[in-house]
């Protein structure tokens, strides 16, 4: 069987069932459930506390009219974080490396925030396309530039997380391959293994940061289009 550098991004199957589907279903055992035996579980208590703190900080700069977005933004953050971290396991598929999936999250959420602004405060939303104090000859050019900047926001959200995760996975793939190839030279192989360990820690941080950045940018777009 011929393997290439990009085979790690193909979705593995077992008995024609995608392994990602099985792994996502198994996650339900660690999510909070209304069961007396699990109400005092330490892991669930820590999860609930962390989710509460994150949601509180996320909604802090957003007006009260946008607080009903708390559940969907927190759920999106949890989904992205779980997918990113699971993708670091060997022989797994990371769905968030696919631009189509990330755009599927980014485009509807961005469009929803934009439509909220146009519905509730159309004047303020359109005013963002023209900075205050712009000279008259520059008005058409600046409106065009700001419009393009507005339209590429969902693309930037999707490309950012896909590019960062793909680059990190390729680095880990190359480093792990080098570790195995240098097994005949123990010193170099050990040094490469240490580098792989450090790179794995870095990629775990990147996985968490990218999920956080994705949701934070969406919250900023929501803040721009909601009123007090």
UniProtKB/Swiss-Prot annotation:
In which compartments does the protein localize? Answer: Mitochondrion inner membrane
Q: Name it.
A: ATP synthase F(0) complex subunit a
Q: Which residues cross the membrane?
A: 13-33, 69-89, 98-118, 139-159, 194-214
* Major location category of this protein: mitochondrion
The cross-references to PANTHER family, in alphabetical order and at most eight, read: ATP SYNTHASE SUBUNIT A
Q: Does the keyword Membrane apply?
A: yes
> What would be an example GO MF term here?
proton channel activity
Which terms in the GO cellular component ontology are assigned?
A: mitochondrial inner membrane; proton-transporting ATP synthase complex
Protein source organism: Pelomedusa subrufa
Lineage, uppermost ranks: Eukaryota, Metazoa, Chordata, Craniata, Vertebrata
Q: Specify the protein's topology with respect to the membrane.
A: Multi-pass membrane protein
Would the keyword Nucleotide-binding turn up in this protein's UniProt record? no
**InterPro entries cross-referenced by the UniProt entry:** ATP_synth_F0_asu, ATP_synth_F0_asu_bact/mt, F0_ATP_A_sf
Subunit-level organization? Component of the ATP synthase complex composed at least of ATP5F1A/subunit alpha, ATP5F1B/subunit beta, ATP5MC1/subunit c (homooctomer), MT-ATP6/subunit a, MT-ATP8/subunit 8, ATP5ME/subunit e, ATP5MF/subunit f, ATP5MG/subunit g, ATP5MK/subunit k, ATP5MJ/subunit j, ATP5F1C/subunit gamma, ATP5F1D/subunit delta, ATP5F1E/subunit epsilon, ATP5PF/subunit F6, ATP5PB/subunit b, ATP5PD/subunit d, ATP5PO/subunit OSCP.
Q: Which GO terms describe its biological process?
A: proton motive force-driven ATP synthesis; proton transmembrane transport
Annotated keywords: ATP synthesis, CF(0), Hydrogen ion transport, Ion transport, Membrane, Mitochondrion, Mitochondrion inner membrane, Transmembrane, Transmembrane helix, Transport
């Amino acid at each position: 069987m011929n393997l290439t550098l990009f085979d790690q991004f193909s979705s593995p199957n077992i008995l024609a069932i995608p392994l990602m589907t099985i792994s996502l279903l198994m996650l339900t055992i660690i999510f909070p459930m209304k069961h007396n035996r699990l109400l005092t579980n330490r892991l669930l208590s820590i999860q609930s506390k962390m989710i509460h703190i994150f949601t509180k900080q996320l909604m802090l700069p957003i007006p009260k009219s946008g607080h009903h977005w708390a559940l969907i933004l927190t759920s999106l953050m949890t989904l992205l974080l779980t997918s990113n971290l699971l993708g670091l396991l060997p022989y797994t598929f990371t769905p968030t490396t696919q631009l189509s999936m990330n755009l599927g999250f980014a485009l509807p959420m961005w469009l929803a925030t934009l439509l909220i602004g146009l519905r509730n405060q159309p004047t303020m939303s359109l005013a963002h396309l023209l900075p205050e104090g712009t000279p008259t000859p520059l008005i058409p050019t600046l409106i065009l530039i700001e419009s393009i900047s507005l339209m590429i926001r969902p693309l930037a959200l999707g490309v950012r997380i896909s590019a960062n995760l793909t680059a990190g996975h390729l680095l880990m793939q190359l480093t792990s391959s080098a570790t195995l190839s240098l097994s005949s030279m123990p010193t170099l192989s050990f040094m490469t293994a240490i580098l792989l360990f450090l790179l794995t820690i870095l990629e775990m941080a990147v996985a968490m940061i990218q999920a956080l950045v994705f949701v934070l940018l969406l919250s900023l777009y929501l803040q721009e289009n909601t009123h007090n």
